[in-house]
Swiss-Prot record:
A motif (Beta-hairpin) lies at residues 91-114. Keywords: ATP-binding, Cytoplasm, DNA damage, DNA excision, DNA repair, Excision nuclease, Helicase, Hydrolase, Nucleotide-binding, SOS response. This is UvrABC system protein B. HAMAP family: UvrB. GO terms for cellular component: cytoplasm; excinuclease repair complex. The beta-hairpin motif is involved in DNA binding. It is found in: Cytoplasm.
Length: 662
């Protein structure tokens, strides 16, 4: 077995050795929950890599979005070039979930565009877990969605060895059963082709290499791996495992049992609908389900087969789905990166899925078994965990309460100090801001400005542009690729000031930023909480000349705690620098061109069409306000501050409209 081995020109320094030793010791002692508190720029990923090397456990690293997962995966691949580092995120470029809107009698069919490259990477991740122990998978929270039964996946794997007696047609039959398609013309991922005694298979986990099986009678004579483009042999193999082309592949025997159970559930549900005088719904359900059954009998699967996953797995009603977590061996290790954001996401997922399924089941579009094709509930997620390390600069109450051990990583190897925080009065804040911006630009650096409202951000951007300052506004409507391009342009100096509400997302640790300003810092609330203030201050922690200006007439508790914590960290770093003769240096980071990655289509709710929203709530303005307040709190908890601020503005408008009516 390959051992995890970190390859790096750097050795752990500062707080890293202590944190690595402390967390690794906790894992070896069998502690279930631990927390690594690491400030921005302290090398948390390097610490994680060294912990993995020390404990030698297959590892899952959970990130709160696809882009951050890609960044982490890239870093881990640099640290572990000789081990399997895989990437597992949602494979949808675009995803419109199946839904039914009863008010308008509108059925919205599931519509999705699958990214073939990401699907390949998902197959590569699951197959790696069955082939070796030295595996790190970096995943987004989509890994808590149902994935198909790992036991069935393993059982359906075709194992071929040189010299094995095996009938060619029998292998072809098995390939079809695990959802490979024969295609002698367009040879692509998940297909096979046959020419005489030669069988070529293009594995689902590969994009450029395929396998050639050469027969001599009923015996496998040779197995080769070859380049699909050139046809050249890469290597000769003694053994090859061909994993299913779909995670939902099912054996014929199990499929027959599942179909019988689906038919029984259909009969029962149709009777129930008829007894409620829902004749149309009963007829619709019968027609749709029978069509799916016919497809399963003919080709082994159907569109939306995941809705029958509970029946296909043979699971009891209400039991948790099988997910990526079930593909890992029992002794796996989980790192939850940016846990203060990732955990609330995990908690929220199942509730949203259920509300969408309610109308599909009620109106005869799906059988009740569709409820069990869902993400894990938070309790189920907890039950599947073995050992967990929460990683965050600002861990939440949950992480700190559950952790038996907490390691702190305050010292940065670069010697960089947390920025100095200056508090200035609100009166004249815009004029003072303009002066500070001009001084920073003269020194060749960039500026981040955070505001409380969307309108203020827009007005400030317009004002600064009028004053001749090259400024851009980063708002929630900008997709991931455009966001990355804006950050790239800021670093290159195409513009100097970036204004926004939520500057806490990935990709904003920019070394060129030497000034972060927080307008209306004394307005206590979700946008100016201790967590968000500490995170915002951290945006300036990559530059040796950086500072933070908070504009506020009073010092709130959140401001006080942030200033106290920042000063504590500065003192620790200064003492370390003095002791070791370290001179703080700004991080040197290459400005890479924007990588064209396809991003998951995030469902966005439109909150601006209030008339339509009120209609759907029978013009009950109080109920709509209550709903939006819940969504605002949830968005704030997830650090989605632009969304929360927009919802807050919508709530104000609704309340004003209500007062006007009275």
């Amino acid at each position: 077995m390959n051992q995890f081995k970190v390859i790096s020109k750097f050795n752990p320094t500062g707080d890293q050795p202590k944190a690595i030793k402390s967390i690794a010791k906790g894992i070896e002692k069998g502690e279930k929950f631990q927390t690594l508190i690491g400030v921005t720029g302290s090398g948390k990923t390097f610490t994680m890599a060294n912990i993995i090397e020390k404990v030698q456990k297959p590892t899952l690293v959970l990130a709160h979005n696809k882009t951050l997962a890609a960044q982490l995966c890239s870093e881990f691949r640099e640290f572990f070039p000789n081990n399997a580092v895989e990437y597992f995120v949602s494979y949808y470029d675009y995803y419109q979930p199946e839904a039914y809107v009863a008010q308008s009698d509108t059925y919205i069919e599931k519509d999705a565009s699958i990214n073939d490259e990401i699907d390949k990477l998902r197959h590569s991740a699951t197959s790696a877990l069955f082939e070796r122990k030295d595996v790190i998978i970096v995943a987004s929270v989509s890994c808590i969605y149902g994935l198909g039964n790992p036991e069935e996946y393993k059982k359906l794997t075709i194992s071929l060895r040189e010299g094995m007696e095996k009938d060619r047609d029998e292998i072809i039959k098995k390939l079809v059963e695990i959802q490979y398609e024969r295609n002698d013309i367009d040879f692509s991922r998940g297909t096979f082709r046959v020419k005489g005694d030669v069988l070529d298979i293009f594995p689902a986990s590969s994009s450029s290499k395929a396998v050639r099986i050469e027969f001599f009678g009923d015996e496998i004579d040779r197995i080769k791996e070859f380049d699909v483009l050139t046809g050249e042999t890469i290597t000769k193999l003694k053994h090859i495992s061909i994993f299913p082309a779909s995670h939902f592949a099912t054996s014929k025997d199990r499929l027959e049992i599942a179909i019988k159970n689906i038919e029984e559930e259909l009969e029962e549900r149709v009777k129930e609908l008829v007894s409620q005088d829902k004749i149309l719904e009963a007829q619709r359900l019968k027609q749709r389900t029978n069509f799916d059954i016919e497809m399963m009998r003919e080709v082994g699967y159907c569109t939306g087969i995941e809705n029958y996953s509970r029946v296909l797995d043979g699971r009891a009603k209400g039991t948790p789905p099988q997910t990526l977590l079930d593909y890992f061996p029992q002794d796996f290790l989980l790192f939850i990166d940016e846990s203060h954001v990732t955990l609330p996401q995990v908690k929220a997922m199942q509730a949203g899925d259920k509300s969408r399924k309610d109308s599909l089941v009620e109106y005869g579009f799906r059988l009740p078994c569709a409820y069990d094709n869902r993400p894990l509930t938070f309790k189920e997620f907890e039950n599947k965990l073995n050992q967990v390390v929460f990683v965050s600069a600002t861990p939440a109450k949950y992480e700190l309460e559950y952790s038996a051990n907490t390691a702190e990583q305050v010292i940065r190897p670069t010697g960089l100090l947390d920025p100095e925080i200056i508090v200035k009065p609100v009166k004249g804040q815009i004029d003072d801001l303009y002066t500070s911006i001009q001084e920073t630009i003269k020194r060749g650096f960039r500026i981040l400005v955070t505001t409380l409202t969307k309108k203020m951000a827009e007005d400030l951007t317009d004002y600064l542009k009028e004053m001749g300052v090259k400024t851009r506004y980063l708002h929630s409507d900008i997709d991931t690729i455009e966001r990355m391009k804006i950050i790239h342009d800021l670093r290159k100096g195409e513009f100097h000031v970036l204004v926004g509400i939520n500057l806490l997302r990935e990709g904003l640790d920019i070394p060129e930023v030497a000034l972060v300003t927080i307008l209306d810092a004394d307005k206590e609330g979700f946008l100016r909480s201790e967590t968000s203030l500490i995170q915002t201050v951290g945006r300036a922690a990559r530059n040796s000349e950086s500072k933070v200006i908070m504009y506020g007439d009073v010092i709130t508790k959140s401001m006080e705690k942030t200033i106290r914590e920042t000063n504590r960290r500065r003192k620790i770093q200064m003492e370390h620098n003095e002791k070791h003769g370290i001179v703080p240096k700004t991080i040197i980071k290459d400005i890479r061109e924007v990588i064209q990655i396809s991003d998951i289509a995030e469902e966005r709710k439109e909150y601006d069409n209030l008339n339509e929203a009120l209609k759907s709530y029978n013009n009950d303005i109080d109920k709509l306000i209550e709903k939006y307040e819940e969504e605002m709190k949830e968005a704030a908890q997830n650090l989605q501050f632009e969304k929360a601020a927009h919802l807050r503005d919508v709530i104000y408008k609704l309340k004003r409209d209500k007062e006007t009516e009275l």
